[in-house]
Regions:
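Short, surface-exposed, polar/charged, turn-prone segments marking secondary-structure boundaries
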Residues: 11-14, 70-75, 147-152, 190-194
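Short acidic, glycine/serine/threonine-rich loops at helix termini
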Residues: 53-60, 132-135, 173-178
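Glycine-rich phosphate/nucleotide-binding loop
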Residues: 158-194
Length: 194
């Protein structure tokens, strides 16, 4: 790390991440479809997601991100106005706000691509968080939970099914508690309960 290093704003980091992961997914999905004799266009939509500036998450950041920092680096980040949390035995990490998604800015483009029978990759990483200001959009220093944005996209596209891919074997409720439980397939009513 260079002393003159300037970190990019969170919204720019989200856009960059969405772009490079979307590019990779798009190419790999396209190749797999071609290998199976399926000729469909695969498109990645750089996606902004509107969040509420008064969402309680902006007042209580909880989403841990970035690498572990030592005490000196953590103090420098605090001086820059960033929120830092200590993880005992591991070091310090930055925490940011994780507001709920309100709406997807590019939803009409996503729907048009779906209507054109394209494979669409959208809302990567939860989307680029933006605030609406008199019909203008401004990037927000936050991240959006991917699962919540996936649900919002399913809702706004009238999806018949929502499948969330994860690297964990099962989704859990009451994680870390005595009543922790693995979930497999669940109904909408069960999901609303949790």
């Amino acid at each position: 790390q260079h002393e003159d290093y300037t970190a990019a704003p969170m919204c720019i980091c989200s856009a960059m991440s969405q772009g490079y992961i979307g590019y990779d997914l798009q190419n790999n999905i396209r190749e797999e479809l071609l290998n199976r004799g399926i000729f469909r266009t695969v498109s990645t939509v750089l996606t902004s997601v509107v969040v509420d500036p008064y969402d309680e998450a902006f007042y209580t950041p909880t989403k841990v991100l970035g690498r572990y920092l030592n005490a000196e680096e953590a103090n420098l980040e605090r001086k820059k106005g960033n929120y830092i949390v200590e993880e005992p035995g591991k070091g310090f990490r930055r925490i940011v706000s994780a507001p709920n998604p309100v709406s997807i800015v590019e939803i009409d483009a996503i729907k048009a691509l779906l209507d054109a029978d394209q494979v669409v990759i959208a809302c990567g990483g939860g989307g680029i968080p933006v605030l609406e200001q008199d019909n203008h959009l401004k990037g927000a220093s936050a991240v959006i939970e991917k699962d919540l944005t996936a649900g919002k996209m399913a809702e706004e596209t009238d999806a018949d099914m929502l499948i969330i891919l994860t690297s964990v074997e099962k989704v859990k409720i009451h994680m870390g508690r005595a009543d922790e439980k693995d979930l497999g397939e669940i109904t909408v009513d069960q999901a609303k309960k949790y």
